[in-house]
Structure formats: C-alpha cells, structure tokens
C-alpha cells in the first residue's frame, strides 16, 4: 500500500512538472509571437508588406524561419494578427482618454486627430496600397466597421446632447457615406497624389466641421490649433 502511495506521489510530481513546463513553453511562444508581430508591423508600415520577407523577420529576431511559420501560416496571417492588436490598442487608448481626460466629444475628436497625425507619420503609402488588395484584411476592416456602428451612433448622439453636433443631421448617412468615400479614395489610389494627412484634413475633418454647431466648431478649431 505504501508503495502505491509513493508511485501516486511520484506520478503527481511528474504531472505537475509537465504542466509547469508546458506553461513555460506557452508563455515563451506567446512572448515570441508578440515580438514577431511588433517587428513585422514596424517593417510593414515603413516598407510595405510585399517588400518584407519572412526570412528577414526570422533573421531580425534570430529565430528560425520554421518557427515563424509554425506561429503564422503566411504573411497575411501575420499582418492580420498585427492589425487586430493595433486596432485593439487604438480603441483602448481612445476609451481611456474619453473616460479619464475628455470633458466632451470635441476633446475626443481632438485626441483622435492627434493619433491620426502620429499614424500618418509612421505608416508609408505602400502599406495602405497593399492591404486593400488582401481579401482577409478587407474582411477584417468590414467587420470592424460593422462592430463600431453602434458606438459611433452613441457618440454622435452624445455630441448632439452636449450641443456640439447639429440636431438636423442624419448621422447614419454620414457614417455610411464616409466609409464608402474612404474606400473609394483608397481604390482610386489618391494617396499617391496626396498625403494621408491631406486626405484626412480635406475630407474627414471637413465632414466633421459640417455637422458641428458653432460651439462645436469653436472647440474643434481650438483643439486642432493646439497640435
């Protein structure tokens, strides 16, 4: 009987060690996955997706190419994972600012404008050109748009309630038409003629000004003027 207990105890110890080892392996893989994404996204932003090879990524991180492919089946899968993380981080930053710092919707718009300026400085034109030819990326962007609809409508209503957005505007039309126009701008490759900042300032910002009240315009000009 004592021998059985000893065998059971040894079995439990081995199982505990196995679980601990698996946890360490999983943690390492998770950290490596995040490192691959961070490294790849920096390169994608600067040089475009096609120019960056998977073996470049593996050499840059000093891991085997096989390991990279074990984690990400192909480059588009890697890009998609990176875009999902970027989108989640962007939403978290905006939400944190809105809850902790913003006094009204105009403050939030000013903050979003600042984030957009930062991104325009970090991301090259080639990146935008290439991602709009990738089916999985386009599907992800459409899904994000659909999920953000309700939040956007609540934001617009908050702006109306605060007196910064006009009451006579159909914001469903604004939301859908802006999506279609932005998609068409990318399709027509206007970013080759104008910078992304110019497109944002002369389309998105003009559209925002169109549904602001006089009070809203005053705060909008003040927020942007401080950047």
What name fits each language-model region?
Residues 1-23, 154-158, 162, 191-227:
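C-terminal peripheral helix-coil segments that are non-catalytic and often amphipathic
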Residues 74-78, 129:
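A secondary-structure capping/hinge motif
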Residues 62-72:
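Short hydrophobic/aromatic patch on the recognition helix
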Residues 146-174, 178-181, 185, 189, ...:
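Hydrophobic alpha-helical bundle segments that form small-molecule/ligand-binding pockets
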Residues 77-86:
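Alpha-helical DNA-contacting segments of helix-turn-helix folds
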Residues 81, 92-122, 175-178:
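Hydrophobic alpha-helical connector segments
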Residues 1-47, 51-63, 77:
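Basic, helix-initiating cap at the start of DNA-binding domains
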Residues 117-164:
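Short secondary-structure transition hinges
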């Amino acid at each position: 009987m004592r021998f059985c207990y000893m065998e059971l105890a040894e079995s439990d110890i081995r199982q505990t060690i196995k679980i601990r080892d698996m946890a360490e392996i999983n943690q390492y893989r998770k950290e490596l996955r995040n490192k691959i994404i961070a490294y790849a996204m920096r390169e994608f932003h600067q040089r475009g997706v096609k120019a960056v090879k998977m073996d470049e990524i593996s050499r840059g991180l000093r891991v085997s190419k096989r390991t990279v492919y074990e984690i990400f089946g192909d480059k588009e899968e890697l890009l998609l994972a990176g875009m999902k993380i970027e989108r989640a981080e962007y939403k978290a930053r905006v939400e944190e600012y809105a809850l902790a710092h913003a006094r009204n919707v105009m403050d939030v718009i000013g903050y979003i404008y600042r984030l957009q300026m930062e991104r325009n400085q970090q991301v090259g034109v080639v990146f935008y050109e290439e991602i709009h030819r990738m089916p999985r990326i386009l599907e992800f962007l459409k899904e994000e748009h659909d999920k953000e609809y309700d939040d956007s409508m609540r934001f617009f209503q908050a702006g109306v309630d605060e007196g910064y957005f006009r009451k006579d505007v159909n914001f469903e039309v604004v939301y859908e038409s802006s999506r279609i126009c932005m998609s068409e701008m990318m399709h027509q490759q206007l970013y080759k003629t104008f910078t992304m900042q110019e497109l944002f300032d002369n389309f998105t910002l003009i559209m925002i000004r169109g549904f602001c009240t006089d009070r809203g315009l005053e705060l909008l000009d003040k927020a942007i003027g401080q950047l």
